[in-house]
């Protein structure tokens, strides 16, 4: 089962439904817009999924709308009209969504936030560093710097994940360990554990990290970093802490927050009693490790969601 299909099932049950909302396909960008049932102008939250691609965050959009936000899932690869792989994705994809959302009469364009998970968290931090109209960021198990794009099959050429103004963003490349891990996993030698590959790349290519860091000092609002210490995709704790250190070093004048969840895995935030997953099938005989335990992931999710909504309420809903 593809990770995107599993996320479809888990996202739909993540947050309790509080009121009827209306959801419709976006017309000026690829995604879904969900609106609260109440009238008036509302704060906005843009939602970016991870390396599963597609429009999977549409399932969370309705839940954020139930909490009083105009919520828009923004797809950025893997659907018609978009790049088919997570490679050199234009940050202007988010800019187009911002323009479309900002023109709506039911939103307060001065209260716009962005949420991203994993690669979407990486993308959200780049977007918020680029567009001053974003005033709050929730970065779930993110990277505060650009990583190499996810390879296409056996391709070995390194590309950036993102572009700004048509130019590739400086990035941290993978090391040889990453290719070895894929070869071992798909050669029948155990599950795919990406964490050692990212750890090796951070060590071997440490000199590239400063140049690949996003200009988080340009973010016009607070950032919530969420990390999981049993993350088997990448070290979201170390990466989030690099982001926090960068903000402090650059005197970011907002109430930034760092939440670290012990024992939790990469997609803990979307854990439910039915889908508190610690690994996922990625082929007929291969699984990919996500980390955590069912119990730890469920406990962390139950703590994290109220914190996310409280953070966004303080940053956006209360002006």
Positions of PLM-derived features:
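N-terminal cap/lid segment of alpha/beta-hydrolase-fold proteins
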Residues: 18-43
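Active-site glycine-rich loops that stabilize anionic/oxyanionic intermediates
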Residues: 42, 49-54, 118
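Conserved alpha/beta-hydrolase "acid-adjacent" motif
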Residues: 56, 232-242, 251, 269-270
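Conserved alpha/beta-hydrolase
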Residues: 65-81
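Alpha/beta-hydrolase active-site loop
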Residues: 85-105, 126
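Alpha/beta-hydrolase fold nucleophile elbow
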Residues: 106-118
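Accessory cap/linker subdomain of secreted extracellular hydrolases
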Residues: 129, 136-218, 272
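Short beta-strand/loop motif that positions the catalytic acidic residue
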Residues: 219, 225-227, 231
């Amino acid at each position: 089962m593809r990770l995107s299909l599993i996320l479809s099932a888990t996202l739909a049950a993540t947050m309790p439904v509080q009121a009827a909302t209306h959801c419709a396909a976006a017309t000026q960008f690829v995604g879904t817009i969900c609106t609260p049932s109440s009238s008036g102008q509302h704060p906005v939250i843009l939602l970016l999924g991870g390396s599963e691609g597609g429009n999977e965050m549409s399932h969370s959009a309705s839940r954020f709308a139930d909490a009083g936000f105009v919520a828009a899932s923004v797809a950025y690869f893997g659907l018609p009209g978009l790049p088919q792989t997570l490679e050199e994705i234009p940050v202007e994809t988010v800019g187009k969504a911002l323009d479309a959302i900002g023109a709506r009469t039911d939103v307060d364009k001065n209260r716009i936030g962005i949420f991203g998970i994993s690669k979407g968290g990486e993308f959200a931090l780049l977007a918020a560093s680029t567009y001053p109209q974003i005033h709050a960021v929730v970065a779930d198990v993110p990277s505060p710097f650009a990583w190499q794009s996810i390879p296409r099959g056996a391709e070995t050429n390194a590309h950036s994940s993102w572009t700004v103004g048509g130019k590739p963003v400086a990035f941290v490349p993978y090391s040889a360990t990453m290719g070895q891990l894929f070869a071992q996993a798909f050669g029948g030698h155990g599950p795919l554990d990406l964490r050692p590959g990212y750890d090796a790349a951070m060590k071997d290519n440490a000199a590239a990290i400063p140049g690949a860091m996003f200009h988080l000092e340009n973010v016009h609002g607070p950032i919530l970093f969420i990390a999981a210490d049993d993350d088997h995709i990448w070290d979201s704790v170390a990466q989030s802490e690099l982001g926090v250190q960068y903000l402090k070093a650059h005197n970011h004048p907002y109430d930034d927050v760092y939440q670290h969840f012990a024992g939790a895995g990469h997609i803990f935030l979307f854990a439910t009693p039915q889908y508190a997953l610690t690994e996922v099938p990625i082929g007929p005989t291969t699984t990919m490790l996500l980390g955590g335990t069912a119990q730890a992931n469920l406990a962390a999710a139950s703590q994290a969601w109220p914190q996310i909504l409280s953070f966004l309420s303080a940053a956006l809903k209360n002006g």
